[in-house]
């Protein structure tokens, strides 16, 4: 295993200086890497060049579905009662060898911009504490497997970035970082139409009509359609004509995973602790926080004074 003092992780002055300061002060040189998922391809390539082992990791891509919050409670007993909290749901459907499922369901929420690179569009969802927005939204995504890219992490990263660039180009007519969108029925029929009625888009950079199916590989688009049709049988009104799909969601989790040992330390580079979403060990805020806590405890326990 290589020592971090002999092999800089990246050409980042701040991170390299961090290691050097720890070394000179006599403190252990430990550097957790807790990147948000969807990090730059260049950073991952540089890590591979420095002997950090990176694997292709299963992830998902899809769209955000927006519908009135009242409809989000459809099918629930006493839906709309003031004593009840905002309705939530979690759905999944196997379609052939893939799975379509909902992710990041946000009652009373909105769709937000989450791009981390220029010339790319990424959507995400959130709710404020009161969950008082009139819309409910959730990502509807389809699984992407290692076999889709011959288990090559570089191909997986390139695919993710290609989709984000397509989304940017499709929404560009409405302004920088506007998102492509269409009504859910339009998506099911492959029409690329957007009519704004009772449901208004919440993506604050603006939206424009686009054929979302054309932004995805045909197999993934068809799988999403099959999943949405199945959801209509589980929640009546799920594919209501006024529901809006906003795209794309490409970062439910990282397309790669940095290899680490049972003690959470990087296999090839001493002192490096991959953790969280970007490293491929979480898929959301809570799971990333829990993984970060586990890594922190591992580092602390390694240097904690012996009891007694």
Each PLM stretch: what is its role?
Residues 16-20, 53:
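Residues flanking N-terminal targeting/processing segments that define the start of mature chains
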Residues 4-9, 28-31:
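Intrinsic low-complexity, disordered N-terminal segments enriched in polar/charged/small residues
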Residues 5, 11-12, 36-37:
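Polybasic, lysine-rich low-complexity intrinsically disordered segments
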Residues 12-13, 26:
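Intrinsic disorder/low-complexity segments enriched in small, polar and charged residues
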Residues 1, 24, 32-308:
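Residues forming the flavin
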């Amino acid at each position: 295993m290589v020592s971090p003092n002999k092999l800089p992780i990246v050409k980042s002055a701040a991170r390299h200086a961090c290691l050097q300061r720890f070394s000179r002060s006599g403190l252990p040189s430990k550097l957790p890497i807790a990147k948000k998922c969807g990090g730059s391809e260049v950073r991952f390539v540089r890590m591979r060049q420095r002997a950090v082992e990176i694997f292709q990791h299963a992830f998902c891509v899809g769209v955000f579905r927006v519908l009135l919050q009242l409809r989000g409670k459809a099918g629930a007993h006493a839906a709309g009662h003031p004593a009840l909290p905002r309705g939530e749901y979690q759905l999944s459907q196997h379609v052939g060898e893939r799975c379509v499922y909902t992710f990041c369901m946000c009652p009373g929420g909105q769709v937000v911009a989450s791009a981390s690179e220029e010339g790319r569009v990424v959507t995400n969802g959130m709710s404020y504490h009161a969950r008082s927005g009139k819309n409910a939204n959730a990502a509807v995504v389809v699984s992407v497997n290692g076999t889709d890219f011959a288990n090559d992490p570089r191909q997986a990263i390139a695919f993710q970035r290609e989709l984000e660039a397509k989304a940017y180009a499709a929404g560009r007519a409405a302004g920088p970082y506007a998102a492509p969108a269409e009504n859910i029925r339009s998506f099911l029929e492959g029409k690329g139409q957007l009519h704004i009625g009772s449901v208004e888009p919440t993506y604050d950079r603006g939206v424009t009509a686009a054929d979302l199916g054309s932004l995805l590989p045909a197999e993934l688009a068809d799988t999403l359609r099959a999943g949405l049709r199945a959801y209509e049988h589980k929640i009546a009104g799920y594919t209501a004509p006024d529901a809006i799909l906003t795209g794309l969601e490409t970062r439910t989790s990282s397309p790669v995973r940095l290899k680490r040992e049972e003690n959470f330390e990087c296999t090839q580079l001493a002192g490096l602790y991959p953790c969280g979403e970007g490293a491929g060990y979480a898929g959301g805020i809570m799971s990333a926080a829990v993984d970060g806590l586990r890594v922190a405890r591992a580092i602390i326990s390694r240097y904690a004074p012996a009891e007694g």
